[in-house]
């Protein structure tokens, strides 16, 4: 996921030598995807993650105390805006991967990255399996290689026929099927409002 996080940031700078990217399940908005979910402070993973960073680099003055920042900046202010990748600046061809299983950490970042990137050539793959199991699955490694071969080696392969969006519809544990779409959110999606009932 850290590789995806850094890709969102670096690619937003549009370095001329960068020809393609594959952000595989990574956040790009620290406030909404890690520190506060729906405005509610995350007191579990966020603290665990930040304390792990501090433990590794105790003498590094560039490491911010994000747990304290979470207390000092409970609203989405300039502090958090500066730590949000400017996704609209991304013009590089991309293959983004999200998972239904990483809700609240990586899937929002991947979906927003795909939607907001200005890239003309972009694809989204959404699976319902375990994060790293999916990343290293033979068929997904082949998908990544096909994408990179097309953009980095200029190979005339089948990548250009890949649907813009491929997503898994889960039926139960390790059972589901894939569908294709022209965009995300899925065109013709019907949203159903849900309301809390006090009873």
Regions found by a protein language model. Give the residues of each.
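Accessory cap/linker subdomain of secreted extracellular hydrolases
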Residues: 9-89
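Short, Φ-rich (hydrophobic/aromatic) sequence segments
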Residues: 2, 48-49, 195-197
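Alpha/beta-hydrolase-fold serine-hydrolase catalytic core, especially in secreted/extracellular enzymes
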Residues: 16-19, 72-79, 83, 88-92, ...
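Active-site phosphate/pyrophosphate- and oxyanion-stabilizing loops and adjacent acidic/basic residues
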Residues: 8, 111-112
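N-terminal cationic-hydrophobic initiation segments that often serve targeting/anchoring roles
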Residues: 11, 114-115
């Amino acid at each position: 996921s850290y590789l995806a996080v850094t890709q969102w940031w670096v690619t937003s700078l549009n370095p001329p030598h960068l020809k393609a990217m594959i952000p595989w399940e990574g956040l790009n908005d620290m406030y909404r995807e890690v520190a506060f979910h729906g405005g509610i402070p995350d007191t579990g993973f966020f603290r665990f993650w930040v304390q792990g960073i501090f433990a590794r680099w105790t003498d590094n003055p560039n490491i911010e105390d994000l747990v304290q920042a979470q207390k000092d900046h409970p609203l989405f202010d300039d502090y958090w805006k500066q730590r949000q990748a400017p996704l609209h600046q991304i013009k590089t061809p991309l293959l983004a991967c999200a998972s239904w299983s990483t809700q609240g950490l990586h899937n929002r970042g991947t979906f927003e990255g795909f939607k907001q990137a200005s890239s003309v050539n972009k694809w989204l793959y959404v699976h319902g399996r375990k994060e790293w199991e999916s990343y290293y699955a033979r068929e997904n490694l082949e998908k990544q290689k096909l994408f990179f071969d097309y953009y980095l080696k200029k190979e005339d392969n089948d990548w250009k026929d890949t649907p813009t969006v491929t997503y898994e519809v889960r039926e139960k544990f390790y059972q589901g099927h894939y569908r294709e779409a022209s965009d995300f959110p899925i065109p013709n999606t019907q949203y159903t409002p849900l309301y809390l009932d006090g009873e």
